[in-house]
Amino acid sequence: MNKKVLTLSAVMASMLFGAAAHAADTRIGVTIYKYDDNFMSVVRKAIEKDAKAAPDVQLLMNDSQNDQSKQNDQIDVLLAKGVKALAINLVDPAAAGTVIEKARGQNVPIVFFNKEPSRKALDSYDKAYYVGTDSKESGIIQGDLIAKHWAANPNWDLNKDGKIQFVLLKGEPGHPDAEARTTYVIKELNDKGIKTEQLQLDTAMWDTAQAKDKMDAWMSGPNANKIEVVIANNDAMAMGAVEALKAHNKTSVPVFGVDALPEALALVKSGAMAGTVLNDANNQAKATFDLAKNLADGKGAADGTNWKIENKIVRVPYVGVDKDNLAEFTNK
């Protein structure tokens, strides 16, 4: 009787191992540069939601905690676990070459997302792709929004000099999105014939608390009453600026962000923010998951999808959001 029990146990264990092995055939390793980034939190949850609709896929999720060395170690572990594809949100875009060499060693395809690797890095591996946005587009659209509202609100021009006196909260220095948004928002305004004067510019590293501190310092400085527009590279920093302005009883100063986070959309609705730019987290997540799953299954990256791949890159478009079209992006 004991032998029969042991034999049955062995068979069941074998079946369970087989099921686990089968599940491992569609394992996809994912790293997020840090879980507590507002925007990447939305992307992460959207990827997890997409994966739930594909029961044959098992995601192995990792929080890299803004540490590239930690992320490299996580990738080593994922490869050791036999993942069939990697979806990597780099901590440092300059580390793409190192990550690619790890993946190449196991012949594992890789989809980078949100933080764009260099062209050289992407071209170095035939199984490397990128999902993201055209960084300069977000700056251009933000500039268009500011120009639209500047024209509609002549009272914003506090000193009546026809020039926008602005402060700008910048994201991570060197990050492609931060650099492009900072450059192109002002370029677009100037291209439209609007003169600008920078009163302050500093990094707040995409972070609400840091942005609040920066804005608070500016509102306590000599230019406090000259600020006509606040420009932020993302909504998290815009929200920090809103908090600081409220504390200084300056809620009439318009604030513009990027991402169209739910919290920011609520601020646009209330008037605390003048506008934002939709950084389409759901479609970036879906494209990342679709490409990674196809590659894990040995298919072409875009097979059976509507994604357009150009030079190994999927670009998800941005959309400007203000009160005029807010309803399109809420209650979904």
UniProtKB/Swiss-Prot annotation:
It is found in: Periplasm. Ca(2+) binds at residues 157, 159, 161, 163, 165, 228. The keyword Metal-binding applies. Beta-D-glucose binds at residues 37, 114, 175, 177, 181, 234, 259, 279. Beta-D-galactose binds at residues 37, 114, 175, 177, 181, 234, 259, 279. Residues 1-23 form the signal peptide. Keywords: Calcium, Chemotaxis, Metal-binding, Periplasm, Signal, Sugar transport, Transport. InterPro entries: Bact_Solute-Bind_Prot2, MglB-like_PBP1, Peripla_BP_I, SBP_2_dom. Pfam families: Peripla_BP_4. The keyword Acetylation does not apply. GO terms for biological process: chemotaxis. The record marks 97 as: Interacts with membrane-bound trg signal transducer. GO terms for molecular function: carbohydrate binding; metal ion binding. One of its GO terms (cellular component) is outer membrane-bounded periplasmic space. Belongs to the bacterial solute-binding protein 2 family. PANTHER family: D-GALACTOSE_METHYL-GALACTOSIDE BINDING PERIPLASMIC PROTEIN MGLB, D-XYLOSE-BINDING PERIPLASMIC PROTEIN. The ABC transporter complex is composed of one ATP-binding protein (MglA), two transmembrane proteins (MglC) and a solute-binding protein (MglB). The calcium-binding site is structurally similar to that of EF-hand proteins, but is in two parts, with the last calcium ligand provided by Glu-228. Part of the ABC transporter complex MglABC involved in galactose/methyl galactoside import. In addition, binds D-galactose and D-glucose and plays a role in the chemotaxis towards these two sugars by interacting with the Trg chemoreceptor. This is D-galactose/methyl-galactoside binding periplasmic protein MglB. It comes from Citrobacter freundii. The gene is mglB.
